[in-house]
Amino acid sequence: MKTIIVFLSLLVLATKFGDANEGVNQEQMKEVIQNEFREDFLNEMAAMSLLQQLEAIESTLLEKEADRNSRQKRCNGNNVPCGPDHPPCCSGLSCEKTFGYGWWYKSPYCVRPSKG
């Protein structure tokens, strides 16, 4: 009988203090959850700012790549007709009337400049 009374008294004390600790635990859990949400929010904000920075870097790289991939204007090679209706001659060539093709087609041709 004495042991039953001791166990009942321990049960009552444990229940009383257990409820008090449970309330404290609930408050601590609320604080932990709020802190986790704050950390998640801050992490999300940091990720968003990092994403914006990466998008800015990517857009500048794409602009540079687009500039690099742009083709130069086409030019005419050696012995190709040139003039106002045709593309310009490539570097190292000049648009001149020649005796060979010019008299037949009545247009100047891209030729290497004479050294004389």
From Swiss-Prot:
Protein name: U16-barytoxin-Tl1d
GO molecular function: sodium channel inhibitor activity; toxin activity
Keywords: Cleavage on pair of basic residues, Disulfide bond, Ion channel impairing toxin, Knottin, Secreted, Signal, Toxin
Record InterPro entries: Toxin_22 (IPR012627)
Residue ranges listed under propeptide: 21-74
Keyword Glycoprotein attached: no
Superkingdom per UniProt: Eukaryota
Signal sequence bounds: 1-20
GO cellular component terms, semicolon-separated: extracellular region
Tissue localization of expression: Expressed by the venom gland.
Record remark on domains: The presence of a 'disulfide through disulfide knot' structurally defines this protein as a knottin.
